[in-house]
Amino acid sequence: MSTHFDVIVVGAGSMGMAAGYYLAKQGVKTLLVDSFDPPHTNGSHHGDTRIIRHAYGEGREYVPFALRAQELWYELEKETHHKIFTQTGVLVYGPKGGSAFVSETMEAANIHSLEHELFEGKQLTDRWAGVEVPDNYEAIFEPNSGVLFSENCIQAYRELAEAHGATVLTYTPVEDFEVTEDLVTIKTAKGSYTANKLVVSMGAWNSKLLSKLDVEIPLQPYRQVVGFFECDEAKYSNNAHYPAFMVEVENGIYYGFPSFGGSGLKIGYHSYGQQIDPDTINREFGAYPEDEANLRKFLEQYMPGANGELKKGAVCMYTKTPDEHFVIDLHPKYSNVAIAAGFSGHGFKFSSVVGETLAQLATTGKTEHDISIFSLNRDALKKEAVK
């Protein structure tokens, strides 16, 4: 195996694997290095499914990025035998006038002329029999959004990257970096590898390893859980046209997915999580009583027909920045190093376009996408890390 490459990608999860594909597709000699064997269950993006929304409650600035991501997912599905996307639509709702997230989602849809429908109170329960909400709730339904099959996405990118000549080095943690303006060296237990350019997308491990590149970003990894629950398939399944959803209630934001082929309704509590070290995280669902209790609390009140037996649970990670916006930028000192970090629990849907962006940054030092909101130099990153 060669030890010198045009570009080395450290961290071959969703973002890194996508970057590897877009690099290799251009004929760039690419090495992807990962501590595990992606797709795997040790990072941030397993658990079968992820939502892709276009009208974006985290900020209308994300909409063009989301739309490009969707285009790339469609392209990926045409190039692979894996199922990538299902257009379930996405329903976002919460108390009228009491949810900044719902309000921003509606504003984003209006500003960017995205197809959508609005509902209030009983209109919502009339449309979807499985939803129970107070009369003062409002909702926006975005029919063109839906669900991505996360492991399939990563697997497809890996297969295509390798088909285009990329090398994937698994079970190889990076121990150290040496960087100059025209050469990058990564050091591992299997040896050292060099490249002209480096892409760093290490997920939760960014919080531990970026300092070796003389980059300090206030990143905090969190333990996050999802559960799959027995449900009334006639109400809550994809076959019954039940949508993916995000709901803001008194104690935070919940998100979930319809049952696919009897999988059960999947639900997560976005506002939950323990601060962790990615090397010592407890990966057992139910290790904390709140793992299941928080999910049941929501189901009992808002989706009682899905409050059945727990079929399975999964543990993954969020890595948050103080403002919960991403970091996608070039190294402040070395323009041959591109960094992707801090996706704060809402990044997977963008991994296609993040991969494209990283490939552009690595090969040309710039990107066609507006990534100013993701700058390393923004004020929020100069403050203390998330507590």
From Swiss-Prot:
Cellular location(s): Cytoplasm
Reaction catalysis annotation: sarcosine + O2 + H2O = formaldehyde + glycine + H2O2
Keywords, ordered alphabetically: Cytoplasm, FAD, Flavoprotein, Oxidoreductase
Classification via Pfam families: DAO (PF01266)
Record bears the keyword Flavoprotein: yes
Cofactor note: Binds 1 FAD per subunit.
Annotated positions binding FAD: 6-36
S-8alpha-FAD cysteine modified-residue sites: C316
Induction info: By sarcosine.
Domain of life: Bacteria
GO molecular function, one term: sarcosine oxidase activity
EC number(s) recorded for this UniProt protein: 1.5.3.1
Enzyme class: oxidoreductase
Entry GO terms, CC: cytoplasm
Named cofactor requirement(s): FAD
Keyword Oxidoreductase belongs to the record: yes
Entry's transmembrane regions: none
InterPro entries named among the record's database cross-references: FAD-dep_OxRdtase (IPR006076), FAD/NAD-bd_sf (IPR036188), MTOX (IPR045170), SoxA_mon (IPR006281)
Family in the record: Belongs to the MSOX/MTOX family. MSOX subfamily.
Function: Catalyzes the oxidative demethylation of sarcosine.
PANTHER family: FAD DEPENDENT OXIDOREDUCTASE DOMAIN-CONTAINING PROTEIN, PEROXISOMAL SARCOSINE OXIDASE
Subunit structure as annotated in this protein's UniProt entry: Monomer.
Protein name in UniProt: Monomeric sarcosine oxidase
Organism, as annotated: Bacillus sp. (strain NS-129)
